[in-house]
Structures are given as C-alpha cells and as structure tokens.
C-alpha cells in the first residue's frame, strides 16, 4: 500500500492539480476558453525529453532518467520560449512561439519513433506517451513536488492581475499591473508544473481544457478565482479516472491519457452543441 498505492494516489493528485491550475491560468492569460497548458509547447518538449531518455536507453540504466529527461526538455523549452518572446512580446507572439515549439517537439518525437531500433522500442515510446501513473514510486513524487509547488505559487500569485486582464490589457496596465511580468510568471509556473507532470506520467490530455470549463460557472467571470478551484477539480478528475481504470476488468490496464480523452471528448462535443444553440 505504502510503496505502490499511496505514491500513485499522491502523484495523481499532484498531476491533476497542476494540469487543472495551468489550464485555468492559460485561459485567463490568453482570454480564450479553448486555451490549455500545451499551448506554449512546454508539455510537448517535456514529452520529447523523456522520449530521448527511452530512445537512448538511459531509462533502462537509471530509474529516474525518464522523468529527469522530461524535466530537462521542459527547462530547455522554457528558456527558448523566453528568448523568442523577449520583453515586449504580446499574446499573439506567445501563441506563435508555442505553435513553433509544439511543431518542433512533435516532429522530433515522430523522428525518434521512425528511427527506433526495433518495434518493441517504438511500442515502449508510444505506450509511455499515452500517459500512466502505474509503477510510479515515492521517488517520483519527491522529484517533482518542489517543482510543482514553485509552479503553483507563481501561477496563484497572478490571480489579481488575471482578474484585471478581463477588462483589457490597457486597463490592466493602467491599474498598475506589469503585463510582461505577468506573462513571465504564468509561463514559468506552467513550465514548472506541467513540465514536471508530463515528465513523470507522460501526456495526459483534456484535463487542463475541460476542468476550467466545468467549474467556471461556479466562480463567474473571475479567472483569478478559477485558478485554485480548477486545481482541485483537476486533482479529483485524475484520481477518479485512475481509480476507474484500475477497477475496470480490462488487462493490460488502460492508459490514463486514454481515459481522460474518453471523458473529455464527449464533454467538448456537448459544449460545441450548446454554443451552436446559443449562437
């Protein structure tokens, strides 16, 4: 229980909180309800870093090589993102830089799959990319916990500025908020939280997109108040999804990323249908 179940539950809660919080933060920053943590390219870069650890064989020789590779990928992508953006970049530049990072990391991951030495190596990479909490230990929790806590602190500190940003960038600036510093804190916080989450679990989609949508009616048009609520909502969603796949009579065990996508996709279809009726 202590060696397997407890670390898995703790890690699931940490990852879910990171994804939910980051999703709300990105939607608040970009003022777009369709934004999600992967929009800045950090999660794709973290996934590529872990894929490199798998491809090179480092993951077989060192237990923590896989998450460390993901964290290294996230750190390098964050540095590159700040270099590309500079001090005075706006929201459009941020999105374009994120698209470029996503495209490059995705292409590099596909290249690693294409050049895999054998089908088993390619299959290992594909299965890891699907996302899972299986076989994670307390060492994984201790590795990412400080990074996640730092990321959460950065994002939660932006709550007043995000509320002001709903009035427009000019109004927020006139109220005394430094928009460049706001973007830096949100990008840095997302990089720390989501990068470390992807590094230990693989890609788990839809949590950062769906959870803020579900919980936004509870707080109204206040993105700052949505941050903490979405974090807890993300933690609950990931824990419920992981519990469901463990109890499902299917072997081998389903991947967590598959389950969250199966939960998230119907919700998005219903959201599209509701928006179509309201239009």
PLM feature spans:
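Alpha-helical transmembrane segments in inner-membrane proteins
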Residues: 1-279
């Amino acid at each position: 229980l202590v060696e397997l179940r407890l670390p898995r539950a703790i890690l699931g809660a940490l990852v879910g909180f990171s994804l939910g919080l980051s999703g709300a933060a990105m939607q608040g920053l970009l003022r777009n309800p369709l934004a999600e943590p992967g929009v800045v390219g950090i999660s794709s870069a973290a996934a590529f870093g872990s894929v490199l650890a798998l491809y090179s064989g480092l993951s077989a020789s060192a237990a923590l090589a896989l998450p460390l590779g993901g964290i290294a990928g996230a750190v390098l992508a964050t540095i590159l993102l700040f270099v590309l953006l500079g001090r005075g970049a706006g929201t459009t530049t941020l999105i374009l830089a994120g698209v470029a990072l996503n495209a490059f990391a995705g292409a590099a991951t596909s290249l690693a799959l294409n050049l895999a030495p054998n089908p088993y190596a390619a299959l290992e990479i594909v299965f890891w990319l699907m996302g899972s909490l299986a076989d994670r230990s307390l060492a994984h929790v201790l590795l990412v916990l400080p990074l996640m806590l730092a990321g959460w602190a950065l994002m939660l500190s932006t709550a007043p500025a995000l509320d002001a940003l709903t009035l427009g960038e000019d109004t927020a600036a006139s109220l005394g908020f430094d928009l460049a510093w706001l973007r830096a804190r949100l990008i840095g916080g997302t990089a720390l939280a989501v990068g470390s989450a992807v590094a230990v679990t693989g890609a788990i989609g839809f949590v950062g997109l769906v959870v803020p949508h579900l919980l936004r009616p509870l707080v109204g048009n206040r993105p700052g108040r949505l941050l903490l609520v979405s974090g807890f909502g993300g933690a609950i969603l990931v824990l419920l999804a992981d519990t469901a796949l463990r109890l499902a009579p299917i072997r081998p065990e389903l991947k967590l990323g598959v389950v969250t996508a199966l939960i998230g996709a119907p919700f998005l279809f219903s959201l599209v249908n509701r928006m179509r009726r309201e239009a």
